[in-house]
Swiss-Prot record:
CDD domains, A to Z: trimeric_dUTPase (cd07557)
InterPro entries per UniProt: dCTP_deaminase (IPR011962), dUTPase-like_sf (IPR036157), dUTPase_trimeric (IPR033704)
Residues that hold dCTP according to the record: 111-116, 135-137, 156, 170, 180
Role noted for this protein: Catalyzes the deamination of dCTP to dUTP.
Catalytic residues identified in the record: 137 (proton donor/acceptor)
Annotated protein name in UniProt: dCTP deaminase
Protein's pathway: Pyrimidine metabolism; dUMP biosynthesis; dUMP from dCTP (dUTP route): step 1/2
An annotated Gene Ontology molecular function: dCTP deaminase activity
Single GO biological process annotation from the record: dUMP biosynthetic process
Catalyzed reaction equations: dCTP + H2O + H(+) = dUTP + NH4(+)
Gene3D superfamilies in UniProt: 2.70.40.10
Species name: Cupriavidus pinatubonensis (strain JMP 134 / LMG 1197)
Length: 188
């Protein structure tokens, strides 16, 4: 299994629709101001956060249960900047839609710009033949409110291609998050 380069990422995005919309280079400025970068890097792709958020609140529940999650635990928010309360988290989604090839697995890591501020971005791997918008989790580990910027970079996706194609892909299994379009809550 080897990591894939910028050349491979560009080819797969442009010829096979692996990432849509796709940015072939690195974008670091918009409208004359610096932003958290996004687009193709040497061995990965920096994804952007869309402007749809679900901010966690503990007002309506007393326990978090991943097998029986209460959607009233979130407040919906739409905007260019999301403020995450201290020691809390928010869910969002990528601006990009992904179609992962059958021989590829991705790992997604948060950008250091956020990590250095105590904001952790968590995303699970994109499995072979998974497709959809990626649900992102932003954890604010600080005792202060934290900002997340929509339309800017938030995490980097690394693509690994196997020497042999898997026997059963995410699509073959009928994965529960296949084809997700909005910010998707946990499903048991």
């Amino acid at each position: 299994m080897s990591i894939k380069s910028d050349k491979w990422i560009r080819r797969m995005a442009e010829q096979h629709g692996m990432i849509e919309p796709f940015e072939p280079g690195q974008v670091r400025e918009a409208d004359g101001r610096k932003i958290v970068s996004y687009g193709t890097s040497s061995y990965g792709y920096d994804i952007r956060c869309a402007d749809e958020f679900k901010i966690f609140t503990n007002i309506n529940s007393t326990i978090v249960d991943p097998k029986n999650f209460d959607e009233k635990s979130f407040v919906d928010f739409k905007g260019d900047v999301c403020i995450i309360p201290p020691n809390s988290f928010a869910l969002a989604r990528t601006m990009e839609y992904f179609r992962i090839p059958r021989s590829v697995l991705t790992i997604c890591l948060g950008k250091s710009t956020y990590a250095r501020c105590g904001i952790i971005v968590n995303v699970t791997p994109f499995e072979p033949e998974w497709e959809g918008y990626v649900t992102l989790e932003f954890s604010n580990t600080t005792p202060l409110p934290a900002k997340i910027y929509a339309g800017e970079g938030c995490a980097q996706v690394l693509f690994f291609e196997s020497d042999e194609v898997c026997e059963t892909s995410y699509a073959d299994r009928g994965g529960k998050y296949q084809g997700q379009h909005g910010v998707t809550l946990p499903k048991a």
